[in-house]
Regions:
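Extended, compositionally biased repeat/scaffold regions that form elongated interaction surfaces
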Residues: 23-251
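Secretory targeting and sorting signals
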Residues: 1-27
Length: 251
């Protein structure tokens, strides 16, 4: 019995072995679980035990021959040889929860290609993934944005632009002919016929009051632009113009 206790304590502190995971040849045991290779590199690069706490699993197989490991402080590290030059990345908290809801690395977002990072405005956090991004802020929680909608949002300054943070995931429109994300300061809509366009302010309010894309206006086909002393935006079925002095948007 004394020998067994002594052996367990020795293993729990540190050991090195031949290891076939995450592109490495050696690994160590930290508090009872093996951590090795690129996952171990990320573990130490991002602060080690102070950031992650104890490993709660050994390294496990992920989709498409990747690897991952789960840690006590609500975080995981994921690795794939073909992603970001084989660098392992951390994903945690509400962002990890959202990623999990959407199907983890086996779904459209794929593997993380960044660690969780602070947003330039200092108010939120994000991870970029192979297929898109997840952004979190205290006011909006975590939401996914990808594809043409993400590209448009990026063109307009990400979360530092007029639109702010996403307040929904990308969703299918009710009639299933388009996609959209709502943001703190507006929306971005995509349709095959109209392309991808942002819409905000009084023009968005008026469009919404008419029934959104289900109205006779249908989907936006342009960004807003100056015209006739006001601000105008074109749609499949017409235009909406907003005049600052009156504060009214007219079709």
């Amino acid at each position: 019995m004394k020998f067994a206790k002594k052996l367990t304590a020795t293993i729990a502190v540190c050991a090195s072995v031949t290891f076939a995971g995450a592109g490495v040849s050696s690994a160590k045991v930290f508090h009872g679980h093996w951590i090795g290779g690129r996952i171990e590199e990320a573990y130490h690069r991002l602060g080690g035990w102070k950031t992650f706490g104890d490993a709660t699993t050994d390294e496990r197989v992920a989709k498409n021959n990747g690897r991952f490991q789960v840690f006590a402080k609500d975080a995981s590290i994921y690795w794939h040889a073909g992603v970001d030059n084989g660098i392992a990345h951390q994903v945690g908290g509400r962002i990890r929860n959202k990623w999990g809801d959407l199907g983890w690395e086996g779904a459209a977002l794929g593997y993380p290609i960044t660690d969780e990072l602070k947003t330039p405005d200092g108010k939120g956090r994000f991870n970029h993934f192979q297929g898109g991004s997840i952004y979190w802020s205290p006011e909006t929680d975590a939401h996914q944005v990808w594809g043409g909608i993400r590209d448009k949002w990026a063109q307009q300054g990400w979360e530092t632009g007029e639109l702010g943070y996403p307040t929904t995931d990308e969703l299918l429109t009710p009639e299933k002919t388009g996609r959209y994300n709502h943001f703190q300061g507006g929306s971005i809509y995509w349709s095959q016929a109209g392309g991808v366009h942002s819409i905000s302010g009084p023009i968005r309010d008026f469009w919404g009051s008419q029934g959104w894309e289900r109205s006779s206006l249908k989907f936006p086909t342009s960004e807003k632009y100056a015209a006739g002393g006001g601000i105008k935006q074109d749609f499949q079925g017409g235009s909406i113009q907003y005049f600052e002095p009156t504060g009214k948007a007219l079709e």
